[in-house]
Amino acid sequence: MTLDDDDYIKQMELQRKAFESQFGSLESMGFEDKTKNIRTEVDTRDSSGDEIDNSDHGSDFKDGTIESSNSSDEDSGNETAEENNQDSKPKTQPKVIRFNGPSDVYVPPSKKTQKLLRSGKTLTQINKKLESTEAKEEKEDETLEAENLQNDLELQQFLRESHLLSAFNNGGSGSTNSGVSLTLQSMGGGNDDGIVYQDDQVIGKARSRTLEMRLNRLSRVNGHQDKINKLEKVPMHIRRGMIDKHVKRIKKYEQEAAEGGIVLSKVKKGQFRKIESTYKKDIERRIGGSIKARDKEKATKRERGLKISSVGRSTRNGLIVSKRDIARISGGERSGKFNGKKKSRR
């Protein structure tokens, strides 16, 4: 290999390194780097020239002119050089082409972006305008969510207190002096579409009962259940008469519903069904929501029969007897808290 070839190879190597530092290697882009092959071709040429020289020397050796140990060393060195050159040759590998660039699918700009581009404003102004519109939309969404939450709370409150208003309205609210009739008229507000529930417009007995319900609900949340469930002091014979009369009213209500084909909701065992007189007369304040004697019977534990000292544990697979049961029956070892060890005195 001449000096010109060495200079050419060095220049190509420097150019290749500069290109790779700026753009990356050609192999990573899916192309073949031919500058590397030039070096290998030159090396192979040199090695072929060395082989020819060695063959000439070999012919001389056959003639019987020169025979020494140095020739054998040179041959072994040439063989190792040939093996190294064969190993240094690049192996053929499949090309991997990666498309990391933008897609060729055309996405047309929206009408909003077209308008902004036609206006002749800069990109910063356009981005600021877009950010301001997005912030406004987020604020509108937050206000809408807050309004929806407020409406949900008002609806739940109205559903809890609607039975009070309906009970008072059915029970003699046709008179002009009734507070409930005035409440319903004010809640209607002259609209034929429906009643708009507003808390400030509830007046009369309905307002006092609704406020009492809310206070009781808050006290239940805070854990004052016993104070709420505490009954008013009433003589025993009067309370019994009130309970009997209330039970008769409930039976009459259920009978009328059965005759009319109305399916009523189920009530827990021992509790009173809530009807109009329950809310109208506020009877639960005096007699409670259920009969106390039946509640006590329900709360009592069931008798499980005689307590017999049994052995083992019965399962579906049979009787399982533990070592502790065997030791307890045989009496060989003391079983207990201290495992047969005597408690030492201090």
From Swiss-Prot:
Q: Name one GO cellular component term.
A: nucleus
> Where do the segments described as Disordered lie?
22-120, 323-346
Keyword Nucleus: yes or no? Answer: yes
Q: Where is the composition biased (Acidic residues)?
A: 72-85
Record bears the keyword rRNA-binding:
no
Q: Where in the cell is it found?
A: Nucleus, Nucleolus
Keyword field: Nucleus, Ribosome biogenesis
Q: Name one GO biological process term.
A: maturation of SSU-rRNA from tricistronic rRNA transcript (SSU-rRNA, 5.8S rRNA, LSU-rRNA)
Instruction: Specify residue ranges for compositional bias: Basic and acidic residues.
Output: 31-65
Quaternary assembly: Interacts with KRR1.
Functionally, this protein is described as follows: Required for pre-rRNA processing and 40S ribosomal subunit assembly. Seems to act in the processing of 35S rRNA at the A(0), A(1), and A(2) cleavage sites.
The record's listing under PANTHER family reads: PROTEIN FAF1
Protein's UniProt name? Protein FAF1
- State the gene name recorded for this protein: FAF1
